[in-house]
């Protein structure tokens, strides 16, 4: 079974998911492709059979919602803000780091000053935030491994990203993909964490 996912999902959840799945189904061999915005094209072309993505990138595919993960403000450790929550408008007064087609883009005014980072990897953005180059809004999944390097603030108006599994067609999916989808359905039904 060839699956694709974002680097943040690969860091935050995939090891645990694959370990649990392999314990139940050692006969199914897994191949993981870690990519960014290219995942829908990889799914459409058949390069992968299943993609763990956000709902927006699953457009045109059958999508099994699994969990919602909050979007959070990520700022340098010395960012001059006292509270634990921050209005998006205040955050946008700073140089804003984002990648093209990032999930926060639809919520931003078109004239938002930002430094475009041509990277599909949230890790690059987090490193730049840690280096004091600006601020960002990312999925809470993205923060795994960066704790202590950046400061995390809740957004005053909460936003969440719906994550799930996308396949070309539930009916046309192979046995391995259907088995993995059933596993995900059961796993996320028992576990409250995204």
Model regions and ranges:
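A short, acidic, flexible beta-alpha connecting loop/helix-capping segment that sits on the rim
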Residues: 159, 169-171
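Paired acidic/hydrophobic, glycine-rich loop segments that form the ligand-binding mouth/hinge
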Residues: 49-53, 134-139
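C-terminal regulatory
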Residues: 24, 41-45, 58-133, 142-162, ...
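Short amphipathic alpha-helical coupling segments at ligand-binding clamshell hinges
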Residues: 13, 17, 84-87, 172-186
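Central regulatory/effector-binding core of bacterial HTH transcription factors
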Residues: 1-58, 119
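Residue-level recognition of the GNAT/N-acetyltransferase active site
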Residues: 6, 76, 168-169
